[in-house]
Amino acid sequence: MAKRLWIACALFFLCAGAASAQDAKTVLQAAQKAMGDVTSIQYSGTGHLNFFGQAWAPNAAWPTTNLTSYTKTVDYNSKSAKENLIHSEPTPMVKGGGRPFAGDDKQANFVSGQYAWDQPGAAPVPQPGAAAERQLQIWLTPHGFLKAAMENNATAKKQATGTEISFQTGKFTVTGTIDAHNMVTKTETHLPNPVLGDMLVETTFSGYKDFNGVKFPTTIVQQQGGSTVLELTVNSVNPNPGLNISVPDSVKTATPPAIKVDTKKLADGIWFVAGGSHNSMVVEFPTYITVIEGPLSEARSLAVIAEAKRLVPNKPIKYLINTHSHFDHSGGVRTYVAEGATIITQEMNVPFYQKAWAAPRTLGPDNYSKANKEANFLPVKEKYTLMEGNRTLEIFHENGSMHNAGMLIVYFPKEKILEEADDFTPDLPDVPAPGGIRPAVFIANLLKQVQALKLDVATVAPMHGIVVPFSDVQKAAATGKG
């Protein structure tokens, strides 16, 4: 009897799965018929583009820019896409981070199969780390979703808003909704993010219209991490334009750049750790090490941790000072928790990190997710001092920052060294200085804080760029550049 019951249950679930797949096929075929089956598509419009991970405060929206021109061309057969856009800073200036620029910022982004690259000028710039997401974005478009669902044994489930279709492509699960009119109204998936873990990416489609026999939405909104990254009003659609992309040889042969660590001693027991786009500092105390800044990723943090242990052997890393919550400056912080360090950050960041770090990390597990440790925080309100033996390090909340509400700066009174992040980036040889109004605003506030706190600064150690005398900051503030 028990055996017959087990067989009956197995047959029930097998049949239910087959029915779900069959239902999905029927729904997808109806949607393809209603929307029009295409091999490629091009759509253009205007709207807003947001700087992901650069919110002014935890849980605030990503800072927005004006998207004055946007065209995306997708070829589904060759799994290729080209994205051309122009965006500009809004007026008045918005709070938050993001790459500063003056006037119009033009971008050309490509993906073809396993290769991704940008083309800001004549020479392509390989972007191997972007290939997986850009490829996935092809299947998050309405027609791309239908094609990928048909090819990947999708399943169907009835919901109040329509039929939910789900399928697996590689390690990613993609889900979408098809409404009663057979239109794709939403697609969603998750991407790995060093701060947010398995991060929800949700794209909604509305205002469908007929463009030369093909139905396409006139409003597209994509959110990542719960906040909008793209809001597009579509004004032109070209079905089946074709897309002939040839992957440049330099892109085919490109490999991810090796992580470099270039260390400069600033004073006894104080080192500036550079070698990439973001810097850190290693500070020796009599019985422990403090590291300032855990940017980018776990890989970067592991390299800095190894360097800290080389510089100061046989001492534990007790503290990691996180200057602010922007993702490029906090992507490697969790690695220090796994190392056993306490995280010093402005108090407003603590609830944000606690919530973000509790999210699942099935797509990109890191050392902290494997360590089974609880994160310890030392929240800073306005000032906190680390003092042991002859070493004194002062941490201040930078009030009035338009870049980040929880910005911290670090000062060494004996050595007259100031650490700062994103307020001032020294000019580098052969690298154009950032434009726009934001650098001038940020540097003016930094100088105001230094004066208000009566800090006697001789040297500035920035988290981008090179170590410079404080007089460079004063000159930049006087000329309105930063």
Explain the meaning of each model-derived region.
Residues 17-21:
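Sec/Tat signal peptide C-region and signal peptidase I cleavage site
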Residues 26, 33-123, 151-155, 298:
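N-terminal mature ectodomain segment of secretory-pathway/periplasmic proteins
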Residues 231-286:
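Zn-dependent metallo-beta-lactamase
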Residues 264-308, 407-426:
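Conserved beta-strand hairpin/beta-sheet module of binuclear metal-dependent hydrolase folds
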